Amino acid sequence: MDNDRINIARFIERLDGCFNRNNMKEARECIEYWENEARRLGDDRGLLTVLNEAVGFYRRSQKKSRALRAMEESLSLVEKLGLTQSLSGATIYINAATTLSFFGREEEGLRLYDKAAECYIRSDLTETYEYAALLNNRAGTLNELKRYDEAEENWNEAIEILKKVGYHDGEIAISLVMLAHLTFDRDNTSYEKVEALLDEAWAYLNSDNQAKDGNYAYVLRKCAPSFEYFQRPMEAQALRDVAREVNEAYR
């Protein structure tokens, strides 16, 4: 470790190891340790990286106060470090927007998504995985607000980008599953279209065109309840079983 900086690569490697094992206790301890180290060293950039991971972790753990506290400090650091017009800042905005939307503050979230989108458009980076992730997350917020046409447009654009980029079949599957929900919410008689979207999502979930790591296990667990919701319990259980096997392989 440098005298005044945390080793970000080591932090990410260790945190990824916790997620690959699906060990949330170790993940929390890892985040807390590196956050304390960054604060001790006065390493604002390192702290921003750790806090950004903390935002996502506490959101997934449904720890609202911790997630929002980490989010607010992250946004303050973006201002302090002069990153408001940068792609690094856009990454923070997307995570913050997703968190606000998750906790019912969708309109605030949309403003941050739009701010992040401006960074990618200005940098001519709208055919990237990162921009597709923005579109996916913004679509979810638009869907919550029942702005179905806009949500559908965002998800479809994200899918097309991810297909071009390659190696993100899990994320494509999530988008297709969410489109199935949107289709059903907009018209609950659209059974054939819903089934077609789920069939396509299932194919992407079982594709070999993705790493079988902790993120893959997370994708499977994220999609499983939707297959159950649409009366496909055997597929839902299969997704959970494979997710468990992936995590166990890292232990």
What residues fall within each predicted segment?
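TPR/TPR-like (Sel1-like) alpha-helical repeat modules
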Residues: 156, 196-203, 227-250
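Amphipathic alpha-helical segments of tetratricopeptide repeats
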Residues: 32-37, 75-80, 114-124, 157-164, ...
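Conserved alpha-helical positions within TPR/SEL1-like repeat arrays
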Residues: 12-22, 46-60, 87-102, 129-144, ...
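Flexible inter-repeat linkers and adjacent short helices
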Residues: 1-52, 57-63, 249-251
